[in-house]
């Protein structure tokens, strides 16, 4: 993103599946972020400490994570950033919300604007009917052992005053691969 001028919006970096290894290029790519979301399979508290040197971090447990992070990291997170509601979980089946409900949301919880998951190691960006009931459904891919032709990826999102201005997935060479 170095070639585009940055807006004054809050920039969120979204990462998943580090598996105990934070690629230096991923760290550098997240340096312009005001908040970081990690969608699980962190695999070591050192990863979160390293990310926290850049920005505040919201993280969830993945299927390879254990109780080594304390109570601040659970199976789901529901941050509200600049008025935008997020639902973050590791496995896609756990965060796919239907009108019948989900383990990720309690009765009466507001529906999220953005649903984020990890686990698949494949980037995915859906909007419109494919993202329902959210406006954006996102998997940032993986920075460790990617499972797609895109290689190692992460996502970013600019939000401001309750609006999602831009969402994109980029590889670690900062080439934009998907955008909404």
Q: What are the residue ranges of the model-derived segments?
A:
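Short, solvent-exposed aromatic-acidic interface loops
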Residues: 167-179
């Amino acid at each position: 993103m170095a070639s585009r001028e940055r807006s004054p919006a809050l920039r969120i970096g979204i990462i998943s599946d580090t598996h105990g290894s934070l690629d230096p290029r991923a760290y550098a790519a997240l340096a312009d972020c005001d908040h970081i979301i990690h969608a699980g399979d962190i695999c070591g508290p050192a990863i979160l400490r390293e990310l926290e040197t850049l920005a505040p971090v919201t993280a969830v447990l993945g299927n390879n994570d254990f109780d080594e992070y304390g109570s601040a990291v659970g199976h789901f997170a529901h941050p509200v950033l600049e008025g935008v509601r997020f639902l973050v979980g590791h496995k896609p089946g756990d965060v796919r919300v239907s009108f019948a409900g989900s383990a990720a949301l309690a009765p009466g919880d507001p529906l999220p604007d953005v649903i984020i998951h990890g686990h698949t190691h494949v980037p995915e960006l859906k909007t419109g009917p494919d993202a329902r009931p959210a406006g954006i459904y996102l998997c940032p891919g993986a920075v460790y052992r990617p499972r797609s032709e895109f290689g190692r990826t992460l996502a970013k999102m600019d939000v401001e005053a309750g609006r999602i201005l831009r969402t994109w997935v980029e590889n670690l060479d900062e080439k934009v691969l998907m955008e909404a």
